[in-house]
């Protein structure tokens, strides 16, 4: 399927070093456009179900993704995924996804993320709470990306964090100026407070008129 390249609006310098990139999801649109067109070496961080074989992919897509998050009828979701799951299973095999786990295996996710940065690639995380679906105005950022940034910091990597927002209607990916994790530590705020501030900024990138955002460019 052909996906037209979106416009990239940088509010600062282009991403020229291994970084932590945060983005909204917009269903599959955000991950696909970032994977295909963001001009920097990167790996996506995503749910382990999409990296665990065809049966797992089918179950996740048919129930969690299309039924619970996209609100499809369960029968049609299961029927559609008989075709979609094998194709996406092949796609994800080539994606080099960093699988995220909800249990003790998360340690392997964190270590793989650090290795990715050390190998010169950025890590892309989609921290929004999508349990009730995907929304234009995001309601919550999980703070796990800050745990990852903290692990990086303890291993000597002061990771720059970029907030981005994919504006599907305008086919534009807005990329904010980076913030170093060490600068966040100086604020003496909790992870939840910092995550909330990133959430607010992400929503600003998605809601402000593009001409106003252009005025913020460096």
Name these PLM-found stretches.
Residues 1, 33-35, 107:
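Structured catalytic/translocation cores of nucleotide/phosphate-coupled proteins
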Residues 1-18:
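A short, well-structured juxtamembrane/interface segment
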Residues 2-7, 59-62, 83-88, 121-122, ...:
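A broad, low-specificity signal for short, low-complexity segments enriched in glycine/proline
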Residues 3-6, 96-97, 207:
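Short aromatic/hydrophobic-glycine micro-motifs
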Residues 9, 98, 162:
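General small-molecule cofactor/ligand-binding pocket signal
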Residues 12-14, 35-36, 89-91, 114-118, ...:
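Short, charge-rich binding segments
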Residues 16-102:
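Catalytic core of membrane glycerolipid acyltransferases/transacylases, capturing the structured
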Residues 102-218:
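Non-catalytic C-terminal accessory region of glycerolipid acyltransferases
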């Amino acid at each position: 399927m052909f996906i037209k390249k979106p416009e990239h609006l940088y509010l600062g310098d282009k991403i020229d070093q291994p970084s932590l990139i945060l983005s909204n999801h917009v269903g599959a649109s955000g991950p696909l456009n970032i994977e295909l067109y963001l001009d920097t070496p990167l790996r996506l961080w995503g749910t382990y179900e999409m990296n665990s074989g065809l049966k797992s992919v089918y179950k996740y897509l048919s129930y969690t993704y299309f039924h619970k998050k996209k609100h499809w009828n369960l029968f049609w979701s299961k029927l559609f995924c008989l075709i979609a799951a094998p194709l996406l299973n092949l796609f994800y095999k080539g994606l080099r996804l960093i699988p995220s786990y909800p249990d003790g295996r998360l340690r392997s996710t964190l270590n793989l993320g650090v290795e990715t940065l050390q190998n010169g690639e950025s890590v892309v995380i989609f921290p929004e709470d999508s349990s009730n679906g995907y929304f234009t105005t995001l309601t919550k950022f999980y703070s796990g990306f800050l745990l990852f940034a903290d692990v990086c910091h303890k291993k000597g990597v002061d990771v720059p964090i970029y907030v981005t927002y994919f504006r599907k209607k305008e086919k534009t990916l807005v990329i904010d100026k980076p913030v170093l994790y060490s600068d966040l530590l100086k604020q003496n705020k909790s992870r939840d407070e910092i995550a909330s501030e990133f959430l607010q900024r992400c929503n600003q990138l998605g809601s402000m008129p593009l001409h106003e955002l252009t005025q913020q460019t460096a």
